[in-house]
Amino acid sequence: MKKQFITEGVKYMLISTFCFTVMQALIKYLPQDQISTIEQTFFRSFITTVFCLVFMLKNHITFAIKNVKLILIRSLIGTVSMFSFFYILPRMPLGSSVTIKYLSPVFTALFAVMMLKEKLKPLQWVYILIAFTGVMLLKGFDNRIAFTDLLIGLISAISGGLLYIILRQIGDDDHPFVVVFYFMLIASFISGLAMIPYWVTPDLKDSLVFLGVGFFGFVAQIYMTKAFQEKDDANYLAQFKYLEAAYAIIIGYLWFHESYTILSFLGIIFIFISLILTIRLKSKEKIKLTVEND
């Protein structure tokens, strides 16, 4: 019987990373001198909440939750991660901001060892290092990145890494739409209160952009939640977030005419090598386990 190399969790992550990149590009496209980061956070959260609400009502999905504490923690950490990332998006090239944020798989691997008691094989550490090297090559040491912005980006990466672990702990006890709905609802409430002093009414074009941000954010969030509720190891799935950096390099070049070097494309190759090796290692482990249990 032919074994499946690409799991459902991986498929969900591929969809999620692409949609997140489109959402980020739309945020960067907004007039940053007029619309504040906190207002961007509000519209992204609120519109996604509406999408979730409509879908849940249409499909008769219950609003009841089992892991109240974990979902609350997930929502608060997710809000911090989202705001800090939206803050750095307009302040540096798209590829650079996404690169910094998606150091989160490194933190996920560390949190997985500490919190989920998952064990990393020596080869997995090597593959993480290859991916990390690829991310660094994508933009190198960019002098356009301020130290303060770098720190805020790292906050987003660390909180994002912890976020995946919490989703793994929630598991499939709660429906993915329920998890996303309460995250977006809480984020809307927090950012809605905070944005009152900075409110600027968006025009028609900006409103349409916000609608796109909410839609792509909704799809990305759902598929990321579904991915981490699968049975794959958290550190395995998290490495696919590196693809987002590659997507961002391409979109940044085509849409925002951002300049990149040969090292950037070499970095993309490193990332794909890491992902392919990770998939092969995981597939071999599954085949071995199946044979041993036959």
Language-model-derived ranges and their functions:
Residues 33-80, 159-162, 182-197:
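Transmembrane alpha-helices of multi-pass small-molecule transport proteins
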Residues 98-103, 174-183, 222-253:
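Helix-helix packing/entry segments at the starts of transmembrane helices
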